[in-house]
């Protein structure tokens, strides 16, 4: 979820909290009976989470790293093969084309999604506070990627799909949305934007509501246009929330699977074979778990790098404005 | 024309555009839901003859009957179906069990941990908390395959335990979110209760937990939606219909449809059936869901 952005924010917050607590400790009696027995209770309370963390988060992460150096087909024990998987990765054209396809998908779906959701949030904020309208806008977020993919698979069908019928009615040529190389990824990205846009817009809308109206008064007195005020006042104030939303959407988009698997299945001819799709087919189609683990690790490294880059850019532009 | 009049006119033109845009967005958002319904109530053959009709063509309940297994295989094939059906009640129960149990468990355990991190004084607290937070950095894809191997080794493939445990015990985000909220709460009442001799657990369940009900609801609703719609993890660890959730059933049903001439009406009926529980949840809690989502971004 709110991954890195919140982590950074938390470090600041927890720093404050520790400071506060240190001060508190200085004034209260350190031998106070109030905290006797705290440690025992604390370990009991975190025990379930600790087990979950150790067994299903930490252990699999380390094991994933280990498996990436092995030949492993699940049924027999993993066999250490050193860097072979990594060598294979460097020479695997399908992997690099998958990476390219995924990056193309991420760029399209995150940028388009961001523009539409910022405009939608601003429009909502400006003209209506109706919860019903906001509710309708998040409807696609509530349904699964499988449902969303299936519906659009039908609506984008080249013969009977309503979208092509409308395009043809206006004199256009029918588009092979999900079955042509050029359109497969843009189509999947559009479906993803349709599904996620409302969710992003509602988060941005909530951010807009926290901006006090008094900020705009000076601008209004100066006769600045609404668009100008939006650009010079609203957007900079929204930057932290936009950064959060972009990081979240990028991370999610890199791991797209459901929509692709019910619409294009990665086709035609790998044109929409996104990374998670390829990793899945390696692991469960060819039982090459070692290599699948290597690719997962590569995806992880890419995500970390991108997130840090985004945070860096964000911090740089923050210090510009201050 | 005075300056104010110009401004007012520009103002209302802008408002007109804004409404036009918003209505456009709403139409695109909602139209597919209508199209599901319209197609699901149509006859497959009439549909291919008149695909553009805005209303159901050759109105029939046939697709729903096919999907729910109320039609015989012959009837189903005669109507353009594959003869496959979805035992909806059964998959619905699986989805409810999977989503409810994992959500309730993870929110409950996260609340306990958040209390330990925000209220109790113990050695190793900050270390443990930072350790937990590192889990936020790890994307699902890195842990999913090894977790599949682990669940297989534990002999838990095709069991609810195998589906739920990896998500039901620990969520770094939940713990972090609840801890932040608890740190922001005033502790006066809790301290008073402690001085009066109430035990820590009584304070936790009697005072802290009720005061945290807002964020607990937020995390529950978002968690429930996420688990209900989850497809990838159940795809990995279940192959047996006895535990598969609705998302998988729909995907299997879609695959069983003939590729050359898919049973569109039946597929849309199945899609609608799969979406209805979420739509019902939305009817019941719409306002709170909307507020929860907004809140989750700001916190």
Where are these regions (language model features)?
Chain A
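Low-complexity, charge- and small-residue-enriched intrinsically disordered regions
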Residues: 24, 29, 171-175
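Generic secretory/membrane-interface signal
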Residues: 4, 10, 29-32, 122, ...
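A structural signal for multi-pass alpha-helical bundles of membrane permease subunits
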Residues: 38-322
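Short, intrinsically disordered terminal tails adjacent to the first/last structured region
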Residues: 1-28
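Alpha-helical transmembrane segments of integral membrane proteins
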Residues: 25-37, 322
């Amino acid at each position: 979820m709110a991954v890195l952005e919140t982590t950074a924010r938390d470090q600041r917050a927890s720093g404050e909290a520790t400071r506060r607590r240190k001060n508190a400790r200085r004034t209260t009696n350190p031998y106070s009976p109030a905290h006797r027995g705290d440690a025992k209770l604390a370990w009991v309370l975190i025990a379930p989470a600790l087990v979950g963390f150790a067994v299903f988060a930490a252990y699999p992460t380390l094991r994933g790293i280990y498996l990436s150096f092995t030949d492993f087909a699940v049924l027999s024990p993993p066999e250490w093969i050193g860097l072979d998987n990594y060598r294979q990765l460097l020479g695997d054209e399908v992997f690099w084309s998958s990476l390219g396809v995924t990056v193309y998908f991420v760029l399209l779906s995150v940028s388009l999604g961001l523009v539409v959701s910022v405009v939608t949030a601003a429009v909502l904020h400006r003209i209506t506070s109706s919860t019903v309208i906001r509710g309708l806008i998040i409807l696609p977020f509530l349904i699964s990627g499988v449902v969303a993919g299936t519906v659009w698979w039908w609506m984008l069908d080249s013969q009977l799909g309503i979208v092509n019928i409308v395009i043809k009615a206006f004199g256009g040529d029918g588009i092979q949305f999900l079955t042509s190389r050029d359109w497969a990824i843009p189509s999947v990205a559009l479906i993803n934007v349709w599904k996620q846009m409302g969710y992003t817009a509602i988060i941005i809308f909530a951010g807009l509501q926290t901006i006090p109206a008094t900020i705009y008064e000076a601008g209004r007195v100066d006769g600045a246009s609404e668009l100008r005020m939006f650009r010079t006042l609203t957007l900079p104030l929204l930057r932290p929330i936009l950064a959060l939303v972009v990081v979240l959407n990028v991370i999610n988009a890199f791991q797209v699977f459901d929509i692709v698997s019910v619409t294009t299945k990665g086709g035609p001819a790998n044109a929409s074979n996104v990374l998670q799709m390829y990793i899945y087919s390696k692991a469960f189609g060819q039982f090459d778990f070692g290599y699948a683990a290597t690719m997962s690790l590569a995806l992880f490294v890419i995500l970390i790098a991108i997130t840090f880059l985004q945070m860096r850019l964000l911090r740089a532009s923050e210090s510009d404005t201050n | 024309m005075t300056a104010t009049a110009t401004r007012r006119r520009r103002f209302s033109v802008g408002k007109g555009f804004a409404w036009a845009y918003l209505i456009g967005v709403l139409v695109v958002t909602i139209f597919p839901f209508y199209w599901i319904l319209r197609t699901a109530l149509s006859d497959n053959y009439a549909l291919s003859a008149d695909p553009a009709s805005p209303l159901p063509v050759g109105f029939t309940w046939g697709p729903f009957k096919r999907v729910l297994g109320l039609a015989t295989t012959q009837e189903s094939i005669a109507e353009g179906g594959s003869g496959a059906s979805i035992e909806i009640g059964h998959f619905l129960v699986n989805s409810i069990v999977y989503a409810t149990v994992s959500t309730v468990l993870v929110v409950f355990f996260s609340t306990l941990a958040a209390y330990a991190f925000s209220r109790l004084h113990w050695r190793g607290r900050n270390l443990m908390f930072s350790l937990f937070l590192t889990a936020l950095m790890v994307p699902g894809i890195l842990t999913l395959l090894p977790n599949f191997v682990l669940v297989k080794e534990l002999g838990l493939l095709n069991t609810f335990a195998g589906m739920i445990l990896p998500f039901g015990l620990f969520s770094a985000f939940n713990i972090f979110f609840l801890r932040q909220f608890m740190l922001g709460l005033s502790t006066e009442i809790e301290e008073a209760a402690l001085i009066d001799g109430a035990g820590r657990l009584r304070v936790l369940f009697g005072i802290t937990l009720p005061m945290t009900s807002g964020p607990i609801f937020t995390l529950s609703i978002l968690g429930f939606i996420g688990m209900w719609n989850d497809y990838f993890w159940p795809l990995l660890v279940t192959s047996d219909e006895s535990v598969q959730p609705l998302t998988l059933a729909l995907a299997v049903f879609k695959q069983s449809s003939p590729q050359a001439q898919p049973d569109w009406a039946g597929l849309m009926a199945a899609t609608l059936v799969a979406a209805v529980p979420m739509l019902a949840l939305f009817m019941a809690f719409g306002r709170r869901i909307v507020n929860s989502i907004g809140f989750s971004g700001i916190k």
